[in-house]
Amino acid sequence: MMARYIAGSKYPILLTAALLAAPAFAGELGASSCTSLNLCPCSDVATTSVSVQQSSMQSMSQNAGQMTMSMPNMKMTAPTTFIEEILAHSAAGTAAEPNSTPHDMLMAQRGAWTFMFHGVGFLNSQQQTGPRGGDKVFGTSWFMPMAQRDLGNGTLTVRGMFSLDPATITGRQYPELFQVGETAFGKPIVDGQHPHNFFMELAAIYDWKLAKDTLLSFYAAPVGDPAIGPEAFPHRVSASEDTLAPLGHHLQDSTHIADDVVTLGLAYKIARIEVSGFHGREPNEHRWEIQAGAIDSWSARFTLNPTKDWSGQYSITHLTSPEQLFPSEDTLRMTASVTYNKPLRDGAWGNWATTLVWGRNRNSPDAEIFNSYLAESTARFANHNYAWTRIENVDRTNELLLGENPIPPGFQERFVARIQAYTFGYDHEWNFIRHISTAFGGQYTLYTAPPSLDPIYGSHPMGVLTFLRFRAIPSEK
C-alpha cells in the first residue's frame, strides 16, 4: 500500500528530498551535536557545540553534556547557567529546556554571524481500528535555520521555521483517534490532526545583558510562539521520535504557531518571567499563508531551571476568539510542566528525557472547564536505539459525537468523556548518508474510553504507526 501511494503522489517524496538535501547544506555549514548553541569566534566552517564562554576557548571533548574538539584558541562547552541556555535559543519561540538537553545542529561562521540549521522529517503509515479508525500515509516535518551575532551589549538572533506538512498531509488532516480542537473547510476536525503551517516561525530576538546574571529579552514575530506552555511537542526531546500530536495538544501548546507575537522576558540566574501579546485566532485550512491579525490576546509564563537537568514552567493566557466555528467564545488557558533530561554515561551511551504536562482550558461565557494530563519519556541508548512512551488522560467534548458533520445551529461544547491513551514505540537509526540519520520504527497506541462511546469507537480502539525518520546530524555522531 505504501509503495503504491508513493508511486502515485509527489507529496511524501518532497519530505524525503528536503531531508536528503541537508548534506549539501551540511557541506557548507559543518555539523554539531550540542547541548546548546551561541555565538563564538570559530573558524570559517566548524563542527562544534558552542558556548557563550568565548574568551576561554581552547579544546573540546565530546559527550552529551559537553563537546570537545581540538581547535586553535577555542574551548567550546555546554551551557552551565540558565542565562547561557536562553542565549542558545535552541528551542522554539522563547521556551526553555534543561541545560543538558542535546541538539543536533549544522553550523558555520561567516564574519560576525554564526549560522545554524536543524530539522527532522517523518514518512508515516498510520492504521487504526474501529468504526472511526483511519489509514493513511503522510509526512510530517520541520526545519529551522537560525543566525546569531553580537550587537551592542547583547545578542541578535534571527530565526525561521518551516514545515512541508501542507504538501505531505492531504485533506488537511491525518487520522488520530479521539483528537479534536481544530477546523478545516468550515467543519470541525474530529479523530484527526491538522498539518502545521508552512511558516511555523519568523522571528527576531534581542537579548540585552543587563548584568552578569540578568538578561532582558525582546522577541518579535509575524508568526511565532508566544510565552505559553512547555516546549511545543514537535521540538521536545522527550517526544523526539513520536511525530503524532498529543491528544491534549489544544489544551497545552497549540499556540506554538501564532500570528503577530511580541514577547518581553526578564531572566535572573535560574528564573525568568515573560509576557506576550499576540493574535489569538488559530490558523484555518490555508496552511501556506501567514494569517495576520490584531494583537488581542496575552500570556504570562514563569520558568525555573534550578539545575542543568531540570526545567519547569507555569503559564496563563487569555485567547480571544481562538476557534473559527465559535467566534464569540474566548479561552482562559493554564499550563504547568516539568522536564527532566539526563545524558547517559555523560552522553557517551545516550540520553533520557521526560516531560510531565498539565493543561486546562476554561471557555467563556459558559465557563466549561477541560483538563489534560501528559507523561512522556524517550530514551536513546547504545547511541542508535530509541524507546519511548506517552501516556495521556484528557477531557473530550461533545464534538466527538459530530464526526465529520458540520456544527449544528445552537451547538454548545460540553464535557462528554475522559479518554486515556497509552503509546509505546521503538526505532533504530543508521547513518547511511553523511549528516543524515535514518531511522525505521513504529509505535502502538491503545485507547480506553467510557462504554457509552463503544458504539462509535468500538470496545478496544487502537492504532499502529510505522515510519521512516530523517534527521540532520553531525558527521561524528
Language model features with spans:
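Outer membrane beta-barrel transmembrane domains
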Residues: 316-326, 353-367, 372-376, 384-433, ...
